[in-house]
C-alpha cells in the first residue's frame, strides 16, 4: 500500500460514522485526507480525524467539483449514506475518477424491485409480494393476505416501512411508504417471522466472495417498526446450509453485473 502514500483523498461526509472509518483507514496508508460537508465538526465524525476540513455541502455537485479540483484530489470516497454515495458517484463521473460501482449497478442494488428481479433471474429465492391497484375510488387491496410489510421501493435507512395486520393499517402505511419514495413507488411483501441474518460479500475485479454471515438478535419493539439490534453473532448458525444451497448462485448473480 506504500504506493498510496502522499495521495490526496476527498471524502464526502455527514453524520454517518462509516466515513470516519474511511478516513482513518486512508490515513494509516499515508493518504492525505480532506473531508467536506456543511455540518459542524461535532456532528461529522469523519472531520475529527481529517487532515483538512472543508464546508462545501455534499448536496452541491458544482461546488464539490470545484473543491476537488482546488484540493487536487487523487480520489473521492464516502461512507455508507446512500445520498452521499450517489453524490460521490456523480462527482467521480464528472471528474473521470474511479468509484467502486457504476450507476447501473447502483440502480439495481438500491432499488428493491430491480434487485428482486436480478435475484429471480439467478434463481435466488425472494419473499412473495403483492400488487394492488389504485383507482379513482381508492386502493383495491382485496388480494392481500396479512400480515404484510410495506416499503418504499427506493427508500433507505428504514424510513417509511410498516408492518400491517389489517386493511386500515395497510392504507395508512401505503401512503406513508409513498411519501418516503423519491418516485412514489411502493413494494408490498409477505411479512415473514423468522431468524434474521446478515450476509456480507466483497467484489474485487469482478469476482464475488462471501466474507461473513451473522445472526442478528433484536430487542423487543417499543412500538416502532425499526427494532434495534442487541447482538450480532458470528458465524451464523445457518452458514453451512447457506453455503451449500445459495452462496454460489448469489456469487454468480453479483458477478453478472460486474
Model-derived features: positions:
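ATP-binding N-terminal substructure of ATP-dependent carboxylate-amine bond-forming enzymes
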Residues: 1-105
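Active-site nucleotide/adenylate-binding loops and adjacent lid/helix of ATP-dependent enzymes
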Residues: 106-187, 193, 204-205, 235-251
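Short, charged, surface-exposed secondary-structure boundary motifs
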Residues: 44-48, 63-66, 107-114, 160, ...
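ATP-dependent carboxylate/phosphate-activation module, predominantly the ATP-grasp catalytic core
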Residues: 190-193, 197, 201-258
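Glycine/Thr-rich phosphate-binding loops of Rossmann-like dinucleotide-binding domains
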Residues: 19, 86, 158-159, 197
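Flexible, glycine-rich phosphate/dinucleotide-binding loops
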Residues: 18, 42-43, 138, 170, ...
Amino acid at each position: 500500500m506504500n504506493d498510496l502514500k502522499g495521495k490526496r483523498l476527498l471524502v464526502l461526509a455527514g453524520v454517518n460514522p462509516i466515513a470516519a472509518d474511511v478516513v482513518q483507514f486512508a490515513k494509516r496508508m499515508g493518504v492525505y485526507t480532506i473531508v467536506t460537508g456543511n455540518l459542524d465538526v461535532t456532528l461529522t465524525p469523519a472531520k475529527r480525524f481529517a487532515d483538512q476540513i472543508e464546508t462545501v455541502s455534499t448536496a452541491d455537485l458544482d461546488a464539490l467539483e470545484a473543491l476537488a479540483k482546488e484540493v487536487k484530489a487523487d480520489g473521492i470516497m464516502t461512507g455508507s449514506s446512500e445520498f452521499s454515495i450517489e453524490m460521490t458517484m456523480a462527482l467521480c463521473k464528472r471528474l473521470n475518477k474511479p468509484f467502486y460501482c457504476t450507476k447501473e449497478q447502483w440502480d439495481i442494488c438500491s432499488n428493491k424491485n430491480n434487485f428482486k428481479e436480478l435475484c429471480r433471474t439467478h434463481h435466488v429465492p425472494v419473499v412473495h409480494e403483492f400488487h394492488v391497484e389504485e383507482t379513482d375510488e381508492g386502493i383495491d387491496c382485496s388480494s392481500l393476505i396479512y400480515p404484510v410489510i410495506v416499503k418504499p421501493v427506493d427508500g433507505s435507512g428504514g424510513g417509511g416501512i410498516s408492518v400491517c395486520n389489517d386493511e386500515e393499517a395497510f392504507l395508512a402505511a401505503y401512503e406513508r411508504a409513498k411519501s418516503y419514495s423519491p418516485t412514489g413507488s411502493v413494494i408490498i411483501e409477505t411479512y415473514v417471522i423468522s431468524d434474521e441474518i446478515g450476509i456480507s460479500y466483497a467484489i474485487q475485479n469482478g469476482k464475488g466472495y462471501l466474507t461473513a454471515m451473522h445472526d442478528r438478535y433484536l430487542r423487543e419493539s417499543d412500538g416502532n417498526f425499526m427494532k434495534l439490534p442487541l447482538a450480532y453473532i458470528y458465524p451464523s448458525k445457518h452458514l453451512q446450509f447457506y453455503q451449500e444451497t445459495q452462496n454460489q448462485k448469489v456469487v454468480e448473480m453479483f458477478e453478472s453485473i460486474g
